[in-house]
């Protein structure tokens, strides 16, 4: 009886251990889908993918041309993570659309630039010029702050403080510039119709524009706009998230960013 009872206890203990191990394994994944933006983000994640594979994590890279789509895809479960946005953009999306998403790691800083097909120096910007800026709140605010830093406009102090500037917050505009909000992806294609346009680095890269060589007005490289990896809140502590972050923060990925982009993208880790 005692031997039988001991065996029964051992079997139950082993079963419990196997169930616990199985549950932990079920929480982890060996294959994930990550949404990135076309261009720079796509190139970086090809390296991340190789590093992650050595750790047994298969990363499927899903490329997006529209900033409005990756968070919706993540929230709906079509993606496991995304890596394309900075914190102000994520905050705005959460507020506007109710996504339950959280950042888990920083990736790169991508300074914003203004580009032109018509002038070579920002000092040559004519009166009444059409100026393209992004129509999403966070990047539009960013473009307006850059115009203010060049003395081209001034903004309401409260809007600057809260990072909520829109064209309606312009207080002075001595050159009578015409601010033209457009979708971020459309701005490179609109350069022939605009005097200058604010273009995010991933779209600039795709259009054959170099931040270091072609931008005529440049955002400081260090600022609050470091990009990040986001996941659903329910997933933030899962082992595969740590493995993904470890792969992105590897020396191999850092070296690739520094050598490939020559200052137009800067590792934020």
State where each predicted segment sits:
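A conserved helix-loop-strand patch within extracytoplasmic ligand-binding domains
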Residues: 104-154, 254
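Ligand-binding "clamshell"
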Residues: 92-104, 117-119, 193, 198, ...
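Short, well-ordered beta-strand elements
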Residues: 28-39, 59-63, 130-131
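Immediate post-signal peptide segment of exported/extracytoplasmic ligand-binding proteins
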Residues: 23-33, 52-53, 122-128
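Short helix-initiation/N-cap motifs at beta->coil->alpha
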Residues: 62-72, 159-189
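Alpha-to-beta junction loops
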Residues: 75-85, 129, 152, 175-177, ...
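Pocket-flanking alpha-helical
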Residues: 67-98, 113-115, 120, 204-208
């Amino acid at each position: 009886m005692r031997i039988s009872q001991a065996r029964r206890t051992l079997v139950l203990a082993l079963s419990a251990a196997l169930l616990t191990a199985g549950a932990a394994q079920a929480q982890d994944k060996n294959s994930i889908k990550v949404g990135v933006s076309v261009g720079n983000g796509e190139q970086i994640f090809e390296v991340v993918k190789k590093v992650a594979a050595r750790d047994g994590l298969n990363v499927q890279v899903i490329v997006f041309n529209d900033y409005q789509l990756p968070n919706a895809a993540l929230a709906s479960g079509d993606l496991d993570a995304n890596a394309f946005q900075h914190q102000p953009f994520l905050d705005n999306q959460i507020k506007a659309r109710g996504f339950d998403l959280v950042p888990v790691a920083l990736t790169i800083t991508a300074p914003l630039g203004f580009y032109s097909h018509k002038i070579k120096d920002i000092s040559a910007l004519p009166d009444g010029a059409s100026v393209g800026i992004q129509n999403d709140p966070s990047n539009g605010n960013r473009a307006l702050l850059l115009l203010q830093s060049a003395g081209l406009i001034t903004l309401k102090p409260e809007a600057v403080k809260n990072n909520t500037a829109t064209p309606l917050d312009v207080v002075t505009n001595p050159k009578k510039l015409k601010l033209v909000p457009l979708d971020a992806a459309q701005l490179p294609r609109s350069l022939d119709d605009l005097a200058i346009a604010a273009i995010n680095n991933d779209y600039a890269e795709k259009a054959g524009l170099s931040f270091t060589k072609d931008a005529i007005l440049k955002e400081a490289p260090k600022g609050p706009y470091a990009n990040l990896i986001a996941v659903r809140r329910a997933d933030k502590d899962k082992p595969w998230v740590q493995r993904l972050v470890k792969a992105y923060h590897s020396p191999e990925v850092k070296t690739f960013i520094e050598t490939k982009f020559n200052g137009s993208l800067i590792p934020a880790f």
